[in-house]
From Swiss-Prot:
Domain spans labelled OCT: 352-430
Coiled-coil region(s): none
Source organism of this protein record: Staphylococcus aureus (strain MRSA252)
Name of this protein: GTPase Obg
One Gene Ontology cellular component annotation held by this UniProt entry: cytoplasm
Gene name of the record: obg
Amino acid sequence: MFVDQVKISLKAGDGGNGITAYRREKYVPFGGPAGGDGGKGASVVFEVDEGLRTLLDFRYQRHFKASKGENGQSSNMHGKNAEDLVLKVPPGTIIKNVETDEVLADLVEDGQRAVVAKGGRGGRGNSRFATPRNPAPDFSEKGEPGEELDVSLELKLLADVGLVGFPSVGKSTLLSIVSKAKPKIGAYHFTTIKPNLGVVSTPDQRSFVMADLPGLIEGASDGVGLGHQFLRHVERTKVIVHMIDMSGSEGREPIEDYKVINQELAAYEQRLEDRPQIVVANKMDLPESQDNLILFKEEIGEDVPVIPVSTITRDNIDQLLYAIADKLEEYKDVDFTVEEEESVGINRVLYKHTPSQDKFTISRDDDGAYVVSGNAIERMFKMTDFNSDPAVRRFARQMRSMGIDDALRERGCKNGDIVRILGGEFEFVE
C-alpha cells in the first residue's frame, strides 16, 4: 500500500523537575542548598531513511509522545536528559504545521534530521537560586512543558522518471512490463489512484526509478480529480514521459490530449514547462494509430521527438528505455529539486529566530476578571510550583519585574480583583 500524505500529533517530553534539598553531612557546617536540576525533555526528531518508500508506518499510529526528563536529585545531581524520539521518514518528505500551513522541514537526503517538536528544559533546583541575601532558598522550579503540535507529512516521490497522461493511456501497463512493479491494471479510468514505483533496467545495464502517476484530467492544476495530490509528485522527477493514446479509442484527439496535459503541468508549476519530456505514442497496434501519428507529428513539429510503442505487443519498448536513459544521462547533473525549493523560499530545515517573549496582553473575561496572556508569563506559570509559598512569592516578583502589575493598574485593576493566567486565578493585592 502506498501512503503519501498523513496527519499526526506530536508531544515533546517535559523537562524534569528541579528539587529542593540541602546538604546534611555530619562534618559540613552550614551545608546549604543541594537540589539538582531536572533533565531535558526529549525532542521529536524526523530522520530520512532511504530504505523507506511510503508513510505507511504513520497510518496506524497517529500520536507520538516523547519521554520526560528525569527529575533532579539531592547532592546537586542533575537529572538525566531524555533520549530524543526519532521518527524515520522516506526521502522527499515535507513536514508542515497543520495550524499555520508553514513548512517546517523538507527532508531529501539520507540521514538528514529536523527537530520538529522541542523538548522542555529541566527545572532548576534550589541551589540555582542561592544569593547572598537568600543563601538557602526553599523553592525549586518545575520542568518546562515540551512543545505540542499537529503536523502533516507529505511525500513527494524521488523518482527519476514520471509517467503522465490522461487515464487509461497505458501508463500502468508500461511500468508492469519494464519493471517488477505490479500496479493495478483495468479497462476503466482511474484504476491507478496511488503512485507506483518501479526500478527499470535497460538492455545495456543502465537503471532508473520510474513512477506511474495517476491519470490527469483537465483542471488538475486547480485540484480537479485530486489533481494537486497527483501533480506534486511530478515536481521532483528529472524526466517526464508523456504518454498519449494515439488510437483515440477513448473518444479524444491525441493532439488535444498533448496540449491539455502540458497546460496543466505549466499551470501547476511554471518550471515543469521546461522539464525534459519524452512523448510516447501508445496503442500503435490499433488501426487508427498510424494515421493519427502522422497528423500528430505535423501538428507539434519536428522539434518534439515522438516514440511510437505498443504496450500490448511490446513493440519499440527497448528503444523507449534507451531514450529515457539517454535523457537522464544528459540531465544527470541538474538538480531540479533545489531550484524549486529556492524559487519558493523553502529551506530544507526551518530554523527560526525566536524573538523576545517578554510581551504580554491583558484582556477582560465576561465576569470582569483580568486575563494575562503571553509566552513568557505562561511559561513561568507552568514552571512554578504553586504548592510552595516561596515559589509563589518568586512568581509574584517576576510579574512585577515584567511590568504586569503596572499594566494591570493602568487597565483599572483594583485591590481584590481577580487575575487569570492559563488555568490559575489570583487576587490582585496592592
